Amino acid sequence: MRCVILSACPVSPELKRLLRPDDFIIACDAGYRNCAPLGCKPNIILGDFDTAPCPVQQNDDIIVLPHVKDDTDTEYAARLASEKGFTEVLLLGALGGRRIEHTLSNLATGLGLEERGVRATLQDERSRITFVRSGE
């Protein structure tokens, strides 16, 4: 099974084609807003909810993170996906946006997943980023 992490950069409905029926979806903070255009429901919502209010949904697992922390919400979600044993992670809403440091951090998150043996892909409407490991 694959984990899809939805970060906060807005995504277009055309990315819905990337989703699979058995994907496990983690929405990070304002990334929850990306569920509507993608037509999906998250399995877990997590974040410090500094950029969007904590959604109130029945039957959703919600993990509230502290406001002061060393990792981004997306990094926390990636670590959670790795701990749950996913071998593939697709990050949507992780490229672009108003803050370049978030894009750079998300690239580092993808690399961190790869270093833990998890195949990572960051994708938006214009770009698809994967990582080539030594020996491939």
Q: Which residues fall in each region the model found?
A:
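Short, well-ordered alpha-helix to beta-strand connector turns
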Residues: 22-23, 42, 59-60, 86, ...
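Short phosphate-binding loop-to-helix
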Residues: 62-84
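General beta-strand structural signal in soluble alpha/beta enzymes
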Residues: 6, 26-29, 47, 63-64, ...
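Short Gly/Thr/Asp-enriched flexible loops that form oxyanion-binding sites at enzyme active sites
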Residues: 100-111
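N-terminal beta-strand-loop-alpha-helix module at the start
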Residues: 1-55
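Internal, active-site/partner-interface "lid" segment
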Residues: 94-101, 128-133
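Class I SAM-dependent methyltransferase SAM-binding "motif I" and its flanking Rossmann-like core
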Residues: 111-136
